[in-house]
Swiss-Prot record:
One of its GO terms (biological process) is steroid metabolic process. It comes from Cavia porcellus (Guinea pig). It is an enzyme of class 1 (oxidoreductase). GO terms for cellular component: endoplasmic reticulum membrane. It is a peripheral membrane protein. This is Cytochrome P450 3A17. It comes from the Eukaryota. Belongs to the cytochrome P450 family. Induction: P450 can be induced to high levels in liver and other tissues by various foreign compounds, including drugs, pesticides, and carcinogens. GO terms for molecular function: heme binding; iron ion binding; oxidoreductase activity, acting on paired donors, with incorporation or reduction of molecular oxygen, reduced flavin or flavoprotein as one donor, and incorporation of one atom of oxygen; testosterone 6-beta-hydroxylase activity.
Length: 503
């Protein structure tokens, strides 16, 4: 049997030419950094360096930082991405040249109307949306929302107590994920849910689908390898966000607006109501109200951006406290002294608790939810005396910087004292960036810290956390783009009432 197909000469020539053209496409940009004398990992045809992310972007960035120093080049498919780690360079990108050159984040996936979301929007559209939304994240607005969040602090304690009373170790992500989801839906949409006990609630089920991304899936890889497919997918109305979830929230926002226009009753404060209310003010050249589509995009993105920030960080904090019982005890002492008899904190008191702040900051140093900060240049630019063309991506490997021994003695150790008042002054704000930096930093930073700190206070007022045989020590991190443990964190949870009775 002839194993080689009997094609005509013309067919063989066409096939050979196609392979040559494919190879040229697959490698045409891969000499970009070599010409500039910038080191970096060798890219593969078509894929660039993305297959190296299989062990985790955080791991890849640490290895590159150790091997190549303060600057290196990599390729996401054919796209060149410059990695920088020097504080002066980082400041130039995130602050000094934010509006002129590095206004926009890298966004390569088809997003449909979600392109209007704050995190994805670009240039003047982003500036206008950011200005509109900033007034909803002031400390005054967060104080208005604090009673809602307090309510879910009690639900969190109740749910965890029910699990702890079973006498078995507790998988934390399910409990903390429910707390995060409940708060997001309540503060974004004004809807009360109990996602742990009602997982089939449509709000819960539709919201849960929004952050189920696999960035190494064939669909998303196709966009990385063939960037032109993004436009094709957009034309075909194909998005990385699940259509049924988008349709559900579209209908809800439309119905909420209709009720908002018809009702004069005072509504419970939530971000959707605040955005709808802002449409009542007269537009000016510098103050144009959000459109209905823009409001919808922000509402949905609150879910995407907020869920992992709270739930995963809470898991990492409790793991760190369980493996460092001296730190846990010291934090409980601060909480008990500041809030005797399990008193509920006020917003201001909570934000002034020094050791609580130290513990949260050190956890965010070790486990920043996002591994990287990325920008896309909209003009030609210079860094370190070298010229780069418009469209070059710039990446800051925040996880690698948070674990850099140049800035952090014994960087893999959990030491809240790094963030004491005395030591905090020595921390470079362009090295420690759990929420980014500059005009395009995370707008929800205060909200995230409020949710984290309230949960921590209520948890440690009521429980102590211990390692058990199911606890993975040392903790291994997963390969997801958003930082998570490789395996769920499981701890023994003991009511402090029992501890006191048994003392």
């Amino acid at each position: 049997m002839d194993l080689i197909p009997s094609f005509s000469l013309e067919t063989w020539v066409l096939l050979a030419l196609s392979l040559v053209l494919l190879y040229q496409y697959a490698t045409y940009s891969h000499g970009f950094f070599k010409k500039l004398g910038i080191p970096g990992p060798k890219p593969l045809p078509l894929f660039g360096n993305v297959l190296s992310y299989r062990k985790g972007i955080w791991n890849f960035d640490i290895e590159c930082h150790k091997k190549y120093g303060n600057m290196w080049g990599l390729y996401d498919g054919p796209r060149p991405v410059l990695s920088i780690t020097e504080p002066d360079m980082i400041k130039a990108v995130l602050v000094k040249e934010c509006y002129s050159v590095f206004t926009n984040r890298r966004s390569i996936f088809p997003a449909g109307f979600m392109k209007k979301a704050l995190s994805i929007s670009k240039d003047e559209e982003w500036k206008r949306i950011r200005t509109q939304l900033s007034q909803n994240f002031t400390s005054g607005k967060l104080k208005e929302m604090f009673p809602i969040i307090k309510q879910y602090g009690d639900v969190l304690v109740k749910n965890l107590r029910q699990e702890a009373e079973k006498g078995k170790p507790v998988q934390l992500k399910e409990i903390f994920g429910a707390y995060s989801m409940d708060i997001i839906i309540a503060t974004a949409f004004g809807v009360n849910v109990d996602s742990l006990n009602n997982p089939h609630d449509p709000f819960v089920s539709k919201a849960s689908k929004l952050f189920r991304f696999d960035f190494l899936s064939p669909f998303l890889l196709s966009v990385v390898i063939f960037p032109f497919l993004t436009q094709l997918y957009e034309m075909l109305n194909i998005s990385i966000f699940p259509r049924d979830s988008l349709n559900f929230f579209t209908k809800f926002v439309k119905r909420t607006k209709e009720n908002h226009l018809e009702s004069n009753e005072k509504q419970r404060v939530n971000f959707l109501q605040m955005m709808l209310k802002s449409q009542n003010f007269k537009d000016t050249e510098s103050h144009k109200a959000l459109s209905d589509v823009e409001i919808l995009a922000q509402s949905i993105f609150f879910i995407v951006a907020g869920y992992e920030t709270t739930s995963s960080t809470l898991c990492f904090i409790m793991y760190s406290l369980a493996t460092h019982p001296d730190v846990q005890k010291k934090l409980q002492q601060e909480i008990d002294k500041t809030l005797p008899n399990k008193a509920f904190p006020t917003y201001d008191v909570m934000m002034e608790m020094e050791y609580l702040d130290m513990v949260v900051n050190e956890t965010l140093r070790l486990y920043p939810v996002t591994n990287r900060i990325e920008r896309m240049s909209k003009k030609d630019f210079e860094i370190n005396g070298m010229s780069f063309p418009k469209g070059t991506g710039v990446m800051i490997p925040s996880f690698a910087l948070h674990r850099d021994s140049k800035y952090w003695p014994e960087p893999d150790e959990f030491r809240p004292e790094r963030f004491s008042k005395k030591n905090k002054e020595n921390i470079d704000p362009y090295i420690y960036m759990p929420f980014g930096n500059g005009p395009r930093n995370c707008i929800g930073m205060r909200m995230a810290l409020m949710n984290l700190k309230l949960a921590l206070i209520r948890l440690l007022q009521n429980f102590s956390f211990y390692t058990c045989k199911e606890t993975q020590i040392p903790l291994r991190l997963g390969s997801q783009v958003i930082l998570q443990p490789a395996k769920p964190i499981i701890l023994k949870v003991v009511s402090r009432d029992e501890t006191i009775r048994g003392a």
